[in-house]
Each structure stands twice: as C-alpha cells, then as structure tokens.
Swiss-Prot record:
A biological process term (GO) from this entry: tRNA pseudouridine synthesis
Originating species: Mycoplasma genitalium (strain ATCC 33530 / DSM 19775 / NCTC 10195 / G37) (Mycoplasmoides genitalium)
The protein, known as: tRNA pseudouridine synthase A
Xref: NCBIfam families: hisT_truA
CDD domains xrefs: PseudoU_synth_EcTruA
Enzymatic reactions: uridine(38/39/40) in tRNA = pseudouridine(38/39/40) in tRNA
Length: 244
C-alpha cells in the first residue's frame, strides 16, 4: 500500500461543499467515486480540510492509499476525464506512509475577492459583488485586529473544542479592475472564520460596525456571535503548506 498526496482545483459553485453528503454533489464524493472506479476497489480520499458550499479551491490537498505500481500521469488523466470540467486533479506524488493531508498542515492561505466596481453578471459566482468603494488604508488598519493567536469562536459557525487559531498575516490589494483581494495566512481556520472576518472588515469600513464590537467578540467568545458573514462565492483556498 502506497500513499499519494494530491492537489485538486475546483469551482465550488457546482458543489455542495467538500465533505461527502448523501445524494449531493461534493468534491470528496466525486473524487472517491472516480478513484474507486478506476482502481477497482473502495478508495478513501482525505482532504486537508473542508470547504463549504460555493467556496472554491485553487490548490486543495488530499491523500489516497493505493495498492501496486501505478502510472501517475495516466491515473491523473483518467481521473480528470471523470471529474472535469468543474474539478481537476493537478498532481499526485508519492509520500511517506505516515503523511496525513489534514494533521500535518503548517500553513493555509485563503483569498477573498470583492468587486467594488459595477455589478458584473459574469462574476456573481466568483466574487462578492459589493458595488461600493472601500477605503483600502482603513481595511489594512482594521485587519490588524485579527492578527495573532486568538480565540476565534465568535467568528465560527460551528462548535469547536479548541477555537484558538493563529493568523500570521493578512494582505490587502486593490487591482485596476476595482477588485479588492484579501489574503489570509494561518495555521488553520475555523468554519466560516475567513468569511466572518471579511464581513466585519467591510462593515467597519462602511461604518456599520464599531471597533468596540469587534473587541467584545474576542472578549466574550461565543459560537457565531459575529452574525455577519461574507458570501461563499468570493472565497478561495489558495495554498496548503506542509512541514518538510
């Protein structure tokens, strides 16, 4: 039995999320079905983590265990014939048997895209159509509130036994086409954490939320008390980095 690390990219608008759900189109379900069909036995796909309905991935990672010698390039081509066009396996590489796609993650990078310009019907599944200008310098200043090791339970839509997470860096760029790109670097993220932080930053920017409110969310952590959440369509899992 050999273990392989895979990288998959997908358009989340065509799926009900990563995790398998009965009678629903999910990325994990599609991959397991396709690998099992080609290999000829039940194959379990373990991802680096879950993405919600509508969330996209540029480089989501997973591992699979496969018996015998295989031609990786041929396997990738066969898999992609079954899962395209909205999901594509980019690479498969042999790794140590002890490797785990979820438990050995060092850093995850998420991007969130906001269109501050005119509404664009071609982008509705891929960016938050805010249709409102944002103060970039204020965005950057307010983003520092979320840096460091903190209890982010208020910024999660699920109960967690350990809601302490570390966000090491947040970068914010405005591009010429009125697109604002927020990039989050962290060791891991709670469910909906990035989307809730983005919504807070936008509300702070548009004077719909006070800085004191954010402080209270950290002082009195409670699941989902942040309330506001940016649309899933603007969120992308960009990179997953592992310990060497």
């Amino acid at each position: 039995m050999a273990r392989y690390l895979g990288i998959v990219s997908y358009d989340g608008s065509y799926f009900k999320g990563w995790a398998i759900q009965p009678n629903l189109a999910t990325i994990q379900g599609l991959l397991e079905q396709s690998f099992s069909l080609i290999i000829g036995r039940k194959i379990k796909v373990i991802g680096s983590g879950r993405t919600d309905k509508g969330v996209h991935a540029i480089n989501q990672t997973f591992h699979v265990d496969i018996n015998g010698e295989i031609n990786l390039n041929l396997l990738i081509r066969k898999i992609n014939q079954l899962i395209k066009p909205h999901c594509i396996v980019k690479t498969l590489v042999l790794v140590n048997d002890s490797f785990h796609a979820r438990f050995q993650v060092k850093t995850k990078v998420y991007e969130y895209l906001i269109n501050c310009g005119n509404l664009n019907p071609l982008q509705f599944n891929y960016v938050w159509q805010l249709n409102q200008q944002l103060d970039l310098e204020k965005l950057k200043a307010d983003a520092t509130l979320f840096l460091g090791k903190k209890n982010f339970l208020s910024f999660s839509s699920s109960i967690h036994t350990d809601s302490i997470r570390t966000i090491s860096k947040i970068t914010i760029q405005k591009e010429t086409n009125q697109l604002v790109r927020l990039t989050f670097f962290g060791s891991g993220f709670l469910r909906s954490q990035v989307r809730m932080i983005v919504a807070c930053l936008v509300n702070l920017n548009t004077n719909k939320m006070a800085l004191e409110t954010v402080a209270k969310l950290f002082e009195h952590p409670k699941k989902g008390s942040c309330v506001v959440k940016a649309p899933s369509c603007g969120l992308y899992l960009k990179t997953v980095v592992y310990e060497k």
